[in-house]
Amino acid sequence: MKASEMARPPMRPGNPHAFASPATTPSRTASPNNAQGANVRTTQGGNQAGASEQQQPLDCFVVYELFASAVTALVSFFLVKDCGAVALNYRTFVSKVEPQQEEGKIVTDLDRLYWLTSVHVHWFSSGTLLVSTSTERTLALQCLGDLSEDEQQKLVDRCIRVAPNAMLASISSFDDPRQLSADDSNRRTSKKKAKMDSLEQNIEKWRMSVQRWLSRRGYSLPNLDKNSAWVTIRVGQLAQFPAMSPHLPTSARDVLWPRSLCFMQSLVPDDLKWFEVPGSAGFRDPIDAAQDWFTGQLERDKILDMQRKAKKAEEDAMRRKDEAPGLYPSSPFTARTGVYGDLQPVSGVYPTPPDGIVPGTGISSTDTPSVSGTASNVVLVPGGNTPAINLSAPQDYTTTDNQQHASTSPTFPAPLEPFQTSGEDDDLFEDMEGDGFGGPDVEEADFDFFDGPDGDDVNMADAPALPETTNKPHKQLNNDVAMAHEEEHSVKEEMSDPLAALESALAAPYRPINDGMPEEKVSEKEAKAVVPVEALATSPAQIKQNPPAKKEATPPLSPSAIAKTLQPSPPKKQSSFPASLQRTNSAFHSLDFSRRLSLVDAKYQDGRFAARIEKTEDDESAVNPGRLKSLKDLPLLNKLRYAVASASTAKSTEALSLARAVSDDSASDSESETSDMSEGSPEDPVDTHPLPYLGRLIIPAKRKLPTEGHGTPLSVTSFAESLAGDWQDSNSLLLDESSLTFFEPNTWDWSIPDLSMEPPEEKPLNGKESIAVTQILTDQIVSATLDLLDENALVESTSSIEPSSETRWQICIKELFPKAAECTLSALIAIHDVFPDLSAQAKGQQRPPPRKPNESNAIPSNHMYPMNPPFIRVRRAETHWDLLPPSIAFWEPLGLAPASPPKNVVAFCIYPHSASLRPILDRFMLNLQLAYDTCKLGSHARVETVIEYEGGLVPVKANSQTSAKEAFRALKDTCIQLGKLLAIQYAQLGEQQDTKIDAFVVYMVDPFGNPAALWELCSAFWSLFQAYGQGPPGRSDPTPKPDLVLQIIPIKYLASFDVPVILDAATYVSLAREVYDRCPPSVASTDKTPLSIYKAPAFQLEESLPRNVQFKLLSEPPQDLLRENSYMHIAYAISLDGNWLTAAWSDSCGKSQAVVSYHLGTRVFGDIAKEIWQTTIEILQARRVQWRVCIAKSGPLDREELETWVLLITCPTQVNLFLTILTVIEDPPYKFTPTTPAPSNSSAQANTNTPGSTPQTGVSPDPTIGLTPAATPSADPAPDPAADPEARLIDVTDETWGIILAHRLHNSNSTNQFSPALISGLLVKRGITHATSNSIHHPIPDPLPGPITVAVNILWIGAVGSTWKRAAESRGTQY
């Protein structure tokens, strides 16, 4: 297929998608199978209405899209690989701005500045391939990889864009899933730990797959092996993409993705700091703060002096404390008289809690052996042979680092300063070396055995939290022995119903594990609890082959070890654990006591040191949320009864093992427990970790699940399956490699919506109120001279950056296409389309059109011509003057006045309550009043209404600094109060003024700094308007009320926390004219045939007279001959979300204009277009003349929209219309870069010999500034003042050129879609360049540095009307 065959393609098939929004609806069905993700359009040859049955062998639309997609993919790969850019979608890239130093200063704010680069591929019918790039700078993007840890925690659930396909997602977590699984595995059985290991392997496999997938697309992201380089995101609405695999889910799932490929909108600053509320001083003038700081020097010196003295006193106190003080006789450390001290009495073997009584030094009882060392941590009951009672309790609270503990606290061991740990072995007992008292044979585990919790205190990670007490033991000591016997009897009973048994087990109150058990079992269970998990995986044979290494010297022996050696140990039962497994690091065996010791404990448990907790009237289930009253409270009750009705019997074994794992294997019947363990398989690991957390199900200890003895396929398998949920499934982590197809680039819209505002808590607005608020918001933005959307920050931050940001992309493309030629402006204009010659029968005989008298030669189509700036009409000395736009800057010196009559207003200002902000607003309102009066716009007065609103300043007082919702609610209440006040006192306010009040202007200060907050401000003004329109109840006043006008003032124009804000006079004058334009006309229009949308602006464009007046007889003569062939411009734009459409009407001079917003959420575009067209006809019927109507849309025009407009405008009307439908593209595929030629030697010599005031021979304007329209001859001895460029004051940044291209641009958002327009052209404005940025002041700067380019595509031309019906049928053209 040749490129020339695309010159006249066949009828393009209709768009398969119904119209929703051109910004959100792709023009073609997406298919992410190809490299560019849905760039290839499927062939739809058979869907054409009226097409011939014989199909062409090749579809030019498909061929064009395939070729353009391939070229775009190639360029994209190398831009990512060589330039380090990140592809946001198939042709849009984001990159970091490189810091550059210019004129001795480094540009700031570059850490937040990004480049957005778009690649455009255009294949012309002449065979020329044009690849271009356009780059914009933005501060609205922020990469997750550049965030700090503090900022990350605030961004959970925030909306982000995921590269490389710009998919919408939300941040789920910044934590590593493997760490979460590790924490979760501590509460699970060993089989679950195996699943956790599998999850870690799957996560690692997923990361490797993502790295390979990205490397094939040119990415080489650093530090992907670190956990900090990944983030867990939640991807939703996967059903919008075609299913690549049938087993992949379409619901929201979590995905691990690199942080450097995730972007979001920049964080908004704190918007409540301006309000003065309790606990916050609000705004403070930086000048006052500096003055207070200067005058407070003496006070600061006093404070510093006091701090130095206090620090010195503290150091002296610490130094005295460090000195060795004398020990009191009552101190337990007095027993340490020597290195080891004399033997002192020890009345027990277990440590006591910190609040226990330490026995004094003396002779011990005959039943208690004595040994030297620290005092035992026991409590002694008065009596000779009474054994000690251990009151140690588990520490169920979290200890902070700075918390102080007693010397006997289990958190910090008792200090051992007098002992020597140099490694020397001191033999205290000489003849007892054979009994195991050798120094090297004693290990730290011997002492940890007694320091750790006893059998009654087993740490369970998932046990319900016990109440914190300071000086009372726990509740577990109340009636333990009696309940223990009852439990032993109840556990042995068998129940016929497994559900009843499980319910009975769950309903029992939770108590310690070892209640009522003999001390022999306590020691064995404690030994099991301290065995690490790694030791369980080692066989006994391996332990025997690996003896412990040489041990270092340990502190002196414990009293319990000596007592155990001196006294014979009672016989103990054989355990299924090898001795090496139970205490691998200990040289001694565990101490086993007889049952009589427990009976003795029971005897003295109600002694003086017993703690009793009062019973509360509340239900125990409310105090202990971990215990459930009944199985009906369990969320998995249905699974226990019905879930596994179809489960096979083969699952019973696995379910039994799971149930046995979560049950306690240490019941009172120890013999049966030992036999069960011995009969188990040797491969089954022993459960030694804490009890698992099973949702809300808490399995009490010391009980066997009834399902273990009464297991059936229904009861056992359902219980096992309900507890065997995998971490991966429960957290919806998507680790399937085939899911990477969801991240393929596509042609969907990638604009980031602003979701930072919280939804209002109040009742939402209805449809009419929403449209009214939108209308108010539209009026504020369309005619704003202040920076409401914070767009000037981008211009200020990029003003000193190098103008050419396309160099790096051009170098990469040149290396990719070595034979490609660099495109210049003249070369671009010369690119033309090839039109095949039509047959002679269809073409017929062509005759050149007759030339008119005095007509010059035809202008070629590929021509660039300058467009002179229009004149502006103002009033001076009661006469209308037409001046050039630069004269507006000299409004006051020239004594200019608005072209329309003056408008008198009364002003009020709503601001956040702050004592420091009020005087600033007072000065601001005074300066604005002076500017309004100086420009002769009318009167701008402030009146006294109530005491609270002195000087027209209305404060918004917030009760508390909680959230933005509270501030918006306070603002709305203040507006309602002001509206009611104006409705009552507007007549009195009019009597106070000498002139008639045309409008009440409400200045509303915007302290939020967020564009999304503008909606809330306009909504509050709508509440004010409603309260003002209703008026006082029970009274109707026929006097017309003045209109209400809103003017939003960003807070940055008033005050700042850092520097004083001082506005220049030009800003006040521009704002005064803006307020004038917002007010309605004070008098009616003086035109002969006025339009219904008369606006009465401060100045307007000149009304040019017609070149000729046709004096001829017509059946319908025009009403106004001087206004024949008048223009009416209709422009509209659709929001990115497709919910709103804003249309604007304006005549050629701007005297009559209007802006209206429509809601597309519940209506189709055809209904909105019909309403816009009917409104247009009503406006034009007021003036029966020949109208030229231009319907323009911002952005590409879909085929359905074009067909709708053509259907509407071709209907006969009573007005003669000549219509043109066109599109305006603000970001065209072409971006111009001005070149600066080097000056020649001859011109340099001429400049040195010529005075600076003499005009030089050259071109005008200066070529060093930018583009040059044409050359001008040298100065003539008798120059014409009208032709002299220096005779007029011209703003060089406002110069504009029109370019008519010889080729056609595509009417599409996609660079791969073949959709040529009828005629294409460019509008190029010089704009602010580096040569003019410092010499010309612009109150309203351009959004981007110049040259600024706008593309215009004409799609349809025709004429309709009573006298143009035939012309419409013959001249109407549709592509």
Swiss-Prot record:
Keyword annotations of the record: Activator, Coiled coil, Nucleus, Repressor, Transcription, Transcription regulation
GO cellular component annotations of the record: mediator complex
Name of the protein described by the UniProt record: Mediator of RNA polymerase II transcription subunit 13
Basic and acidic residues bias (residue ranges): 313-324
Record Pfam families: Med13_C, Med13_N, MID_MedPIWI
Biological process according to GO: positive regulation of transcription by RNA polymerase II
Domain of life: Eukaryota
Stated family: Belongs to the Mediator complex subunit 13 family.
InterPro entries noted in UniProt: Med13_C, Mediator_complx_sub13, Mediator_Med13_N, MID_MedPIWI
Biased composition (Polar residues): 22-51, 397-411, 1233-1259
Organism this protein belongs to: Phaeosphaeria nodorum (strain SN15 / ATCC MYA-4574 / FGSC 10173) (Glume blotch fungus)
Subunit structure: Component of the SRB8-11 complex, which itself associates with the Mediator complex.
